[in-house]
């Protein structure tokens, strides 16, 4: 019998998925999944603040820490190369953290099922337990959040990439929503602006 997908509208409802149990003491790897503006980084930061056993790994933060701001400190043409570099480095860091017994938040978009499956398999091979959290946000709310983020005067790794309406449309059209993948769905309108 298929298990139903948990759908939550508060962060506190997610907390039971963030704890190890006597029956399953493996390190937890929470995988954020969502489109730009859905609140992945806000969720990741909330988790690391409220559940200090978790370490955050973010492709965007890695690129920012190692190369600076998109289109400011390096040319736009280097962006995809730096994303590839970040993914490889974070795979290694994930392996080290799991081997050390740490819990991890992977602050990635995980926009495609094949990519999600690849990382789930990696987590399992390393001895961890994955929790896939899909942040379900309406398209109009995503647009509002992305436009607000684009207007920030101070940029960091989480806000450096300019997401235009056209780019967001491509993201929306190409995103593969997880269905029946063992995901937890989080519906938190207004969350990203409040964390």
Name each model-derived stretch:
Residues 38, 46, 54, 140-195:
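Conserved GTP-binding G-domain of TRAFAC-class P-loop NTPases and closely related GTPase folds
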Residues 41-102:
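Conserved substrate/cofactor phosphate-moiety recognition/catalytic segment
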Residues 19-26, 97:
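Phosphate-binding P-loop
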Residues 35-36, 41:
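The conserved Walker
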Residues 81-130:
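Glycine-rich phosphate-binding loop used to anchor ATP phosphates in small-molecule kinases
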Residues 126-146:
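Conserved phosphate-donor/acceptor-positioning beta-strand/loop module used by diverse small-molecule
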Residues 32:
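Hydrophobic anchor at the beta1->P-loop junction of P-loop NTPases
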Residues 1-21:
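N-terminal pre-Walker A segment at the start of P-loop NTPase domains
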